[in-house]
Amino acid sequence: MKRKERRINKDFGYNRKCVCHYEASQKRFCYSQYSCASVLYERVRDIAKIMDRLDSGLDAWCLRDAIISVLRATHCVPRVDRMLGRWYLKTSIFYDFCPDDLILSCPNVIMPNVLNFVKKYRDFIRSVLYKVSVSWKNQYMPGVLGASRFLEEISNSLNGVEESIPCIYLRMCATLTEIVLRNGYLREIYQENPYVIFEELAFSLFTQKWVLPFSCMTNLGLVEKANSTVFDVAIYNTCLYSLADFITVNGEHLFPALLNGSNISMNVTRYQQEAKNIFEILLSQIQVVERDTDKTVQLTVYVEVWHVSALTWLDLYQVLPETSRVTFCLIIPGIFMDRYELKRAQWSLFHKNIAFELGKCDEVTFSTKYLEFERTTDHAKITMASFVEKICRCLKRGRMGLIFRKNVYQYSMIPHVPLYCGGDFLDVLPVRDGINTCLRMLLNVVHFLGDEVSDELTEEIDFVRLQCKFFMFNELRRVVRKMVLVANAVIDYAVDNKDFLREGIVDGRSLGICITGLHSVFMTVGLSYAHPDACRLYRMMCEHIYYTCVRTSVDCCMKGAEPCNLFDRSKYALGMLYFDQFDNVECTLPEELWTTLRKDVLMHGVRNIHFTAGTAMQKEFDIINSSESFWPMEDNKILRRSNIKVVIGKDGLNDVTSVYSSELKSLYIPVYNNLLLNRFNKHQQYLKTVGYRVLNVDTNLFTDKELDDLAVFKDGFSYPLNDLIEMYKSGLPFLDQGQANVFYFNDTVSLKHLLPLLYKTGFKVAMYKVLCSSEMYKHLDLSNPLPLIGKCSDGVVMHVKNIL
């Protein structure tokens, strides 16, 4: 039967009509007829019919806005969430335009070599897309929030038609396969034909075993254009001080990075008089980008605690709105921590030139110079107790990082280079003044749980037994190896196509493989977060990932690639590996593998200088139904308030004259843990009354077995701080970039004790977020439980997040 032709809606502006009552509206779907819970429940089929008439993903975005606007009055939210996620595919061009047809119709947008690849393998590509799309729709397709995340961040229009998710993945797979085939060393390592390479990439992306950053998804394979990038972090390391200097750099690098959806980081304390003006410029640019492009961006501000302006910045941070996407990161030298707990100790703060001289010192000479300047120069003083109190007040507000300068210098693979000016909690290499960056990739370790193993595999090396499950390390190593090859392909692509951030990647070719889904693994196999077996499993994951990354990077050099420019200056040139700098490191892999690797590194070099990172990719995690990083609590549903309107009905349920209120001021978003609900479905109503905090349940209502199972779902406030740090500490010898964590505090615990504990443990970059129990649960009204809105596989407890 001939399929009905459908019109492409290109009227994406103020002139189009709302499809629910056919009146002029700024929104494609204003939802005025469905402003009541009962109406929404009864009219799910009507919504489906309307969605069938939508022409693009942008329309699905508008519909999603409208539905979310009334969610707090809806008792069937999970059903609507799942339904909207399924219908998202039908509103995309995937059903109306084959992705390959769309790509081939856009020679002015898609790179010629990508077009040629799609033409050459068109029939095969169609068969692969059909297979992977079936699996994707049944298992991995995002719900309403995940789908809208795509619509926020990737807004490519190919000749008036927005890309669908399958079209985006096709463009990426075709581009990456073409790069691998064109680069000799990558082709030599793969040793596979184009069909195998393309199919493997497609299945990895659709099933979300690993994820590239959104900036890469947006720009990979498109015709070269000015100020486009595939990197999601831009770090500005500067010795310039004037506002004019900043404006030049901002126009060339920082603002274009924001327009691409990249997070930017810079050290502002070295700007003295102009610092506030610069900060205001950056904040206004973030607002403009988020308003006009729907992309989510973030600013990280680095503050040197020996600079006299540090107090001003800490005071400023305390008055920033909670919703601002600004993270402060304190750069803390060793001498500060030496004085940290001394009674009546004082801290000296220096002015511009002296502070800058201290910033250039390595950690060995920093303390000597600091004491000398204390004796011989004018400076300000503050008691350590007062300074620490300011820091703790800022930490309680959340989104503050710490960089322990001494630990960075001690464990850096590049000696005498100040690596502390990192980006988004990665100590990326600022080897020169200017822009530095890193390619980050997200690895979802949930995919490596299996129910059976082959007799040919070796326990403790190829797999470990976890109660009724197996964690497959052989598969983990295989996937990570392909991730490193893909990362090098993307970096080569950026250099060849004049990516405007390419100068920040060429010397170190740094890549960061960020772990996510770890806690889902623990919950699935029945391990509490701080259980010794959980700590051991996490350490083994980090070990296998690091080994595979270095092994693959060396293999690239053995197949003809040049070592990165920083190799000769690094400790790798001495035949060292990162964990060689730590004492008494437990390794599971055979020693002969490490010995061979050291010899090969010394003889052939490494293609990349950094590999693994225990840090968060804050935007990409949502599309894989996983938490940002590895911590025993979930905090990962963020709705943009700029696009959300609340529909206020008048008299009748079907009143089409309903109007929008002002922009949404507060929206409660309960997030539920799917695994918890499935295991304790019959107790769901009771668990809702205690806010899903398993430590608050009445033990008389559960069997002993159920209580043991419930313990797996404890929230972060239920674990002693030392247990959490031991968990995070276990992976440190194999994480050569920053490790950012969330720390949970009951109100009886003092934040002052956390900093020295992290410092002495050996953390380089830490403290992504601090959550206090009173703040976390202050919006949770247990007398009036709210409906469940999102579905997520990771995390521990259900909670309510307040968007102001």
Curated annotation (Swiss-Prot):
One of the GO biological process terms: deoxyribonucleotide biosynthetic process
GO molecular-function terms, A-Z: ATP binding; ribonucleoside-diphosphate reductase activity, thioredoxin disulfide as acceptor
GO cellular-component term (any): host cell cytoplasm
UniProt keyword list: Host cytoplasm, Late protein, Virion
Protein's cellular compartments: Virion; Host cytoplasm
Short name of one Pfam family: Ribonuc_red_lgC
The family this protein is said to belong to: Belongs to the ribonucleoside diphosphate reductase large chain family.
Subunit details: The genome of human herpesvirus-6 does not code for a ribonucleotide reductase small subunit.
Protein task: Does not possess a ribonucleotide reductase activity. Betaherpesviruses probably use another strategy to expand the dNTP pool in a quiescent host cell.
Protein's UniProt name: Ribonucleoside-diphosphate reductase large subunit-like protein
Organism: Human herpesvirus 6B (strain Z29)
High-level lineage: Viruses, Duplodnaviria, Heunggongvirae, Peploviricota, Herviviricetes
